[in-house]
Amino acid sequence: MPSWHGMVLLPYVKHTHASTHTHTHNIYGCACELVFH
């Protein structure tokens, strides 16, 4: 397995995980911003 495959795949997996996490907690994040900012 060439090393570039992992270098290409890893950011995609991280981005996918980050966006699911963001979508899951989007409402709570907006509420926190409204309250604390």
Swiss-Prot record:
One GO BP annotation of this record: positive regulation of miRNA transcription
Keywords linked to the UniProt accession: Activator, Transcription, Transcription regulation
Keyword Transcription regulation: yes
Function: Regulatory peptide encoded by the primary transcript (pri-miR164a) of the microRNA miR164a that enhances the accumulation of its corresponding mature miRNA. Acts probably as a transcriptional activator of its corresponding pri-miRNA.
Protein name per Swiss-Prot or TrEMBL: Peptide encoded by miPEP164a
Taxonomic lineage of the native organism: Eukaryota, Viridiplantae, Streptophyta, Embryophyta, Tracheophyta
